[in-house]
A protein has these predicted regions:
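Extracellular/virion structural assembly segments
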Residues: 1-139
Protein backbone atom coordinates (compact mmCIF):
# COMPACT_ATOMS: atom_id res chain seq x y z
CA UNK A 1 0.00 0.00 0.00
CA UNK A 2 1.00 3.61 -0.28
CA UNK A 3 -0.19 7.09 0.56
CA UNK A 4 -3.44 8.25 -1.04
CA UNK A 5 -5.58 11.34 -1.52
CA UNK A 6 -9.32 10.73 -1.85
CA UNK A 7 -8.51 7.01 -2.19
CA UNK A 8 -6.28 7.71 -5.22
CA UNK A 9 -2.78 6.23 -4.98
CA UNK A 10 -0.25 9.08 -5.12
CA UNK A 11 2.56 7.04 -6.67
CA UNK A 12 0.57 5.06 -9.23
CA UNK A 13 -1.70 7.88 -10.41
CA UNK A 14 0.40 11.02 -10.07
CA UNK A 15 3.96 9.68 -9.86
CA UNK A 16 4.11 11.46 -6.49
CA UNK A 17 5.95 10.66 -3.30
CA UNK A 18 5.90 12.39 0.08
CA UNK A 19 9.59 12.90 0.89
CA UNK A 20 9.34 14.58 4.31
CA UNK A 21 6.69 15.99 6.62
CA UNK A 22 4.62 12.92 7.51
CA UNK A 23 5.93 13.10 11.09
CA UNK A 24 4.30 16.54 11.53
CA UNK A 25 0.91 14.87 11.17
CA UNK A 26 1.58 13.00 14.43
CA UNK A 27 1.73 16.21 16.50
CA UNK A 28 -1.36 16.67 18.65
CA UNK A 29 -3.24 19.83 17.60
CA UNK A 30 -2.89 23.04 19.57
CA UNK A 31 -5.75 23.81 21.92
CA UNK A 32 -7.82 26.90 21.20
CA UNK A 33 -7.69 29.54 23.91
CA UNK A 34 -10.82 29.06 26.03
CA UNK A 35 -13.25 31.85 26.75
CA UNK A 36 -12.22 33.74 29.85
CA UNK A 37 -13.47 36.46 32.16
CA UNK A 38 -11.21 38.89 33.99
CA UNK A 39 -13.15 40.05 37.03
CA UNK A 40 -11.92 43.30 38.59
CA UNK A 41 -12.48 42.04 42.14
CA UNK A 42 -10.75 38.60 41.73
CA UNK A 43 -7.18 37.45 41.14
CA UNK A 44 -6.35 35.90 37.78
CA UNK A 45 -8.99 34.98 35.26
CA UNK A 46 -11.94 32.61 35.16
CA UNK A 47 -11.84 30.14 32.23
CA UNK A 48 -14.68 28.26 30.54
CA UNK A 49 -13.23 24.71 30.44
CA UNK A 50 -16.33 22.55 30.02
CA UNK A 51 -15.62 22.01 26.30
CA UNK A 52 -12.22 21.72 24.65
CA UNK A 53 -11.61 22.85 21.06
CA UNK A 54 -8.52 22.60 18.86
CA UNK A 55 -6.96 24.66 16.07
CA UNK A 56 -6.37 23.38 12.57
CA UNK A 57 -2.79 22.28 11.91
CA UNK A 58 -0.83 23.81 9.06
CA UNK A 59 1.46 21.13 7.66
CA UNK A 60 4.07 21.40 4.92
CA UNK A 61 4.93 18.21 3.09
CA UNK A 62 7.91 18.02 0.76
CA UNK A 63 6.66 16.20 -2.31
CA UNK A 64 8.21 14.97 -5.57
CA UNK A 65 6.72 14.23 -8.97
CA UNK A 66 8.46 11.71 -11.22
CA UNK A 67 7.30 11.56 -14.82
CA UNK A 68 8.47 10.02 -18.08
CA UNK A 69 8.68 13.34 -19.92
CA UNK A 70 7.41 16.92 -19.74
CA UNK A 71 4.00 16.04 -21.22
CA UNK A 72 3.54 13.29 -18.62
CA UNK A 73 4.64 15.69 -15.87
CA UNK A 74 2.14 18.38 -16.87
CA UNK A 75 -0.68 15.83 -17.09
CA UNK A 76 0.09 14.50 -13.60
CA UNK A 77 0.61 18.01 -12.21
CA UNK A 78 -2.73 19.32 -13.51
CA UNK A 79 -4.64 16.18 -12.50
CA UNK A 80 -3.18 16.26 -8.97
CA UNK A 81 -3.87 19.94 -8.31
CA UNK A 82 -7.38 19.65 -9.76
CA UNK A 83 -8.04 16.84 -7.25
CA UNK A 84 -6.67 18.56 -4.13
CA UNK A 85 -8.28 21.96 -4.83
CA UNK A 86 -11.82 20.60 -5.12
CA UNK A 87 -14.46 22.11 -2.80
CA UNK A 88 -14.79 20.69 0.72
CA UNK A 89 -12.28 18.74 2.75
CA UNK A 90 -10.12 16.15 0.99
CA UNK A 91 -8.86 12.94 2.61
CA UNK A 92 -5.16 12.15 2.96
CA UNK A 93 -4.35 8.52 3.81
CA UNK A 94 -0.87 7.99 5.27
CA UNK A 95 -0.05 4.30 5.06
CA UNK A 96 2.70 4.47 7.73
CA UNK A 97 0.17 5.89 10.22
CA UNK A 98 -2.78 3.73 9.13
CA UNK A 99 -4.76 6.97 9.41
CA UNK A 100 -6.96 9.32 7.37
CA UNK A 101 -6.54 13.09 7.72
CA UNK A 102 -9.12 15.59 6.48
CA UNK A 103 -7.44 18.59 4.86
CA UNK A 104 -7.76 21.41 2.42
CA UNK A 105 -5.14 22.87 0.10
CA UNK A 106 -3.39 26.09 1.14
CA UNK A 107 -0.36 26.55 -1.13
CA UNK A 108 2.41 24.95 -3.14
CA UNK A 109 5.83 26.54 -3.60
CA UNK A 110 9.62 26.01 -3.81
CA UNK A 111 9.34 24.04 -7.05
CA UNK A 112 12.64 22.55 -8.20
CA UNK A 113 12.52 21.05 -11.70
CA UNK A 114 15.32 18.72 -12.78
CA UNK A 115 15.96 16.19 -15.49
CA UNK A 116 17.54 13.11 -13.93
CA UNK A 117 19.12 10.06 -15.41
CA UNK A 118 17.82 6.94 -13.71
CA UNK A 119 19.20 3.68 -15.12
CA UNK A 120 19.97 5.46 -18.42
CA UNK A 121 16.37 6.64 -18.82
CA UNK A 122 15.44 10.31 -18.77
CA UNK A 123 12.85 11.17 -16.15
CA UNK A 124 11.38 14.50 -15.12
CA UNK A 125 11.80 14.95 -11.37
CA UNK A 126 10.13 17.93 -9.64
CA UNK A 127 10.32 18.58 -5.89
CA UNK A 128 8.01 21.07 -4.15
CA UNK A 129 6.49 22.00 -0.82
CA UNK A 130 2.77 21.39 -0.37
CA UNK A 131 1.11 23.25 2.50
CA UNK A 132 -2.25 21.96 3.72
CA UNK A 133 -4.52 22.66 6.68
CA UNK A 134 -5.47 19.56 8.64
CA UNK A 135 -8.78 19.36 10.47
CA UNK A 136 -8.16 18.27 14.10
CA UNK A 137 -8.57 14.51 14.40
CA UNK A 138 -9.19 14.12 18.13
CA UNK A 139 -11.47 11.86 20.11
Amino acid sequence: MSDKINNIDLKETYGLAILTGRERLLAYPERKTPLSFDWQDENGQEYQLKKVFFNDQEITLQMAFMADDNADFWFKYNTFFKEITKPNFQVLWIDDHDMNYQFFYKSANNFNHALKRLKNVNKVFVKFDLTILIKPNVL
